Amino acid sequence: MGNIAILAGGDSTLLPKDHDVYVGVDGGCLKLLEQGLPLDIAVGDFDSVSETDLRQIRTQAKQVVQSVPEKNDTDLELALKVAFEAYPDAAVTVYGAFGGRLDHFLSNIFLPTDPDLAPYIEQIQLVDGQNRLIYRPAGCHEIQPDPAMSYVGFMPVGQGRLEITGAKYPLHQENYFLKAMYGSNEFLDQPIQVSLDRGYLVIVYSKDRG
């Protein structure tokens, strides 16, 4: 199974129609159905939907994984674990992960901190109309430009030392400075080389609101 879309909520109009599997998270299940897309797996505690909506979800979903509200995982974390358990080699794109509650937003950014999701770090991306977020483990990586985006930022997680080569604003031993987020960098008609000695790297492609 190649590509999985997980809709966590938010704007569903950006959702491509060519994913192999569609997973709805809580209220995101209804947005999938509203777009006429299949609801292959419904995941969540469903505390944000009415009883009528929950009956609709149960009727139309091919599989329902309902959790209790009091749990260690967020609904999105649970959805990712369910998806990778069923399709361990899939590439997963998460839509609707950047809006809503700030605590959920931060949890979504740091998904690979969960040891159950860490093995799939390079298979997860988070997307909305203005941003695309991917992850890389410690080591050396070549980062390709995204033609749809204007900027790229790098956030090392885990107190690792980051080096950036081939970008408009390089970062190396001679000019090193410590920041939580190295934002607003740009490509120079070539891939960017990054290296991180420990932890993992959050890479954020972005563009200005148009």
Explain the meaning of each model-derived region.
Residues 1-2, 20, 88-91, 122:
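Short coil/turn segments at beta-strand junctions that form active-site/ligand-binding loops
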Residues 1-57:
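N-terminal beta-strand-loop-alpha-helix module at the start
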Residues 7, 23-25, 66, 125-128:
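General beta-strand structural signal in soluble alpha/beta enzymes
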Residues 60-68, 119-125, 147-155, 159-161:
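A glycine-rich helix N-cap at a beta->alpha junction
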Residues 64-87:
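Short phosphate-binding loop-to-helix
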Residues 91-139:
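Anionic-ligand-binding alpha/beta catalytic cores of soluble enzymes and soluble regulatory domains
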Residues 129-131, 136-210:
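Long, charged alpha-helical interface segments
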